[in-house]
Regions:
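Sec-type signal peptide cleavage vicinity
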Residues: 1-268, 274, 280, 285-290, ...
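Eukaryotic nuclear/nucleolar intrinsically disordered, charge-dense low-complexity regions
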Residues: 296-303
Length: 307
């Protein structure tokens, strides 16, 4: 359902309304999720090993090493091998949901940082027994838990008064931008401190256009600022922003913001803003047209003269 709606007056009589909604179809039915589709090809993930039978027993003292891997079709490519002596281990598997190399793990803490914009996911495998020297252990049936919320923006131009949206870019600012994922309890904790991430579109050309997905840290009762720069009817508009308060984003859920642009004062066509008085209607063709200025007038055949 709808979380919050805010309306804001804008320049040239072009108003902006933002509403943030939850998408039930994008919600997982289990704690561990392959929602959004199975993990994409070329996604990099890391396996960190601790000589502990349980995740609760993990510490920097029993750290045993890490390996980096990348999905490639039905196989896994090794970027950095994880080699372990005989023993019982807990594996922490994590990924930021992209193909980029993950920053080297230093074992300064049994945790890793996460920020808005990252599709952070984890899998914990405890009690792994490595029994034979020289053997290979296969870590199968990995099902990642998604810790962030998936999010996108839909920009909407007013039908009948505006042309298509042909360019769009924006930002989203939230009160919590950074978080820490703890290996010992498999939880992500966000810290206070605002931050901004980009929202992008791929060659938009329609009256309503969806952005690419990005990912946001879970947060409750948050003030979220959406700012857009876009082109409507070949007319550019910059720094159009609105702030919604009381927004809640839950992990492993999908949300979207509808950003609607409307006007009652004219028409945005051909790179210009036309006053209402510029519009005329031709009865023979049953079509509307726009005069090049507000000095030209027209009247119905049975109307009195204007002057």
């Amino acid at each position: 359902g709808m979380a919050k709606t805010v309306r804001q007056k804008g320049e040239y009589g072009v108003d902006m309304e933002v509403s943030t909604l939850h998408c039930p179809a994008g919600t997982a039915t289990e704690g561990a999720s392959t929602r959004w589709a199975n993990v994409d090809d070329n996604i990099t993930f890391r396996v960190v090993a601790y000589k502990s039978a349980t995740a609760a027993g993990i510490s920097t003292a029993n750290y045993a090493g890490y390996g980096d891997y990348k999905l490639s079709g039905s196989s896994v490519q090794t970027t950095k091998s994880l080699i372990l002596p005989v023993g019982t281990y807990t594996f922490i598997v994590y990924s930021y949901g992209n193909s980029s190399a993950i920053t080297a793990f230093t074992n300064s803490a049994a945790s890793v940082p996460v920020t808005n914009g990252q599709n952070f996911m984890t899998y914990v495998k405890a009690g792994v027994a490595i029994n034979n020297i020289g053997s290979t252990y296969t870590l199968g049936n990995i099902v990642f838990k998604h810790h962030c919320a998936r999010y996108r923006v839909q920009a909407i131009a007013q039908a009948g008064r505006m042309g298509a949206i042909t360019a769009c870019a924006g930002t989203v600012t939230l009160p919590r931008h950074n978080a820490t994922y703890s290996f010992t309890n498999n939880t992500l904790t966000a810290q206070d401190g605002s931050g901004t991430i980009n929202v992008t579109w791929n060659s938009p050309n329609a009256m309503s256009v969806y952005s690419n997905y990005t990912y946001l840290l879970p947060q409750a009762s948050a003030s979220v600022t959406v700012k857009l720069g876009l082109t409507i009817g070949n007319k550019p508009f910059s720094n159009r922003s609105a702030t919604l308060s009381g927004v809640t984003l839950n992990a492993n859920n999908t949300y979207y913001s509808n950003v609607s642009f409307t006007t009652t004062e004219g028409y945005i066509i051909g790179g210009n803003i036309w006053a209402n008085g510029n519009l005329y209607y031709t009865a023979e063709t049953k079509k509307y047209g726009i005069y090049p200025n507000t000095l030209t007038c027209s009247k119905a055949d049975n109307a009195q003269d204007y002057f």
